[in-house]
Amino acid sequence: MKIPEIIIVEVLHQPGSLAKVLQVIAEEGLVLEHLTSLRREQGRTLWEITLEMDEDANRSLYQRIDALPTARFVGKSDRVFNRHRGGKIRTVSRSPINTLNILRDVYTPGVARVCLAIKADPRRIHDYTSIDNTVAIITNGTAILGLGDIGAAAGLPVMEGKAALFAELVELSGVPILLKTRDADSVVATICAIEQSFGAIQLEDFAAPECFEIEERLRAVLQKPVLHDDQHGTAVVTLAALITATRRLGRSLRVSSVGQIGLGAAGTGIVRLLRAYGVGRVLGADRNPLAIERIESMGAEGSTLETIMARCDIVIATTGVKNLIPPERVRPGQIILALSNPEAEIDPLTAMERGAAFAADGKGINNVLAFPGLFRGALAAHAPRFTDAMLMAAADAIAQMAGEDLVPNPLDKQVHERVAAAVMTAAMQPVAMGEAGTPEPT
């Protein structure tokens, strides 16, 4: 697995010195992600170099840099760890508590009046607490990023990252919750026991197939939004990218043939949303026959990688297998989304060189574009659940903000505002609120 490695190199400030370092990096077969000048002093420049490096990569790189007459390997940067030190989130008061009167109002004895008001009318919890701005981010650590089953504690930095993004992008409070259980019954029971503290539930990094059962059961018993982000957040951004790509090519997404390679949580969520969107022919490939049965129940067709590459206009891959798609199987005009992180099934540049009309990987097609606005909009509408209409509205909003790219900048707060507004509008429609029929569960 390739994980960004950050090294510090001191280079003489003269022509060609840095180029020699970069040549060594290229000869080692490493990809340069980022290059930053840290400081210059006494004729030397200190450079921070971010590389894509395998965990078992040849560490001769450092010795080769040291061997250059104009450069010196200083060490590795702790930038990533420094940004995590002490955690990435905290709870703060919305207003100063700096007088005894304020203290008595927000805590004892004044808070008792608010407690009694909520006891008399439970709906007032929405007026006098932060519940409508609070999301539980829950994991059991069985499918953390591309790292797999590493345990809930090791996944806490991911959950904190989600919470930080909620706060930064849509001003929601995300609360990471780690569950030390793999059993679906225990997961559901625990979440049901604590759900009153939260306006919505985000399920994160639960392994398939248990993730499907857990989400379905929670949706059946909780009258609040529940979303497994690995399924539906990824599906929303994928749909947005496909809307953008097909519009630019003058094609209809709904009459295109789509192949989904890999039918875990993300792949299954993508198939389900594409079918809900109205895509007529969706093929799916996976080694697990139960996964094939699951998508066939949605109206998709079981298939193989070879058939998908040969017949489909659009190919999506979420297998976690590096270089799974042979470049020679790419057909001119195909749209290729190889979404596995940190390493894709095929490099987008390679796919484009083989004739793909559009190609992207998981670095750009990222669910951070979807989940903040999805939850902000659902909470603002007091929606009892997420519906297909809400997910599709989010995808359309993302596509509308794409500009010259397949998807917009995930740090553009206007994107998240647009997504939230679209989701809230969709949630308020009668069918979404359960007033005119029951929408297909997500």
What do the predicted segments below correspond to?
Residues 1-85:
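A conserved regulatory-domain signal marking ACT and ACT-like small-molecule sensing domains
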Residues 298-359, 364:
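Rossmann-like adenosine-cofactor binding region
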Residues 145, 152-170, 222, 228, ...:
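Glycine-rich phosphate/diphosphate-binding loop of Rossmann-like nucleotide-binding domains
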Residues 225, 229, 338-340, 345-437:
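Adenosine-phosphate binding glycine-rich loop
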Residues 93-126:
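An N-cap/entry alpha-helix motif that binds or orients negatively charged groups
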Residues 138-139, 146-147, 153-160, 184-233:
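Phosphate/diphosphate ligand-binding glycine-rich loop within oxidoreductases
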Residues 1, 40-41, 83, 125-131, ...:
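Solvent-exposed alpha-helices and their adjacent loops that cap or buttress functional pockets
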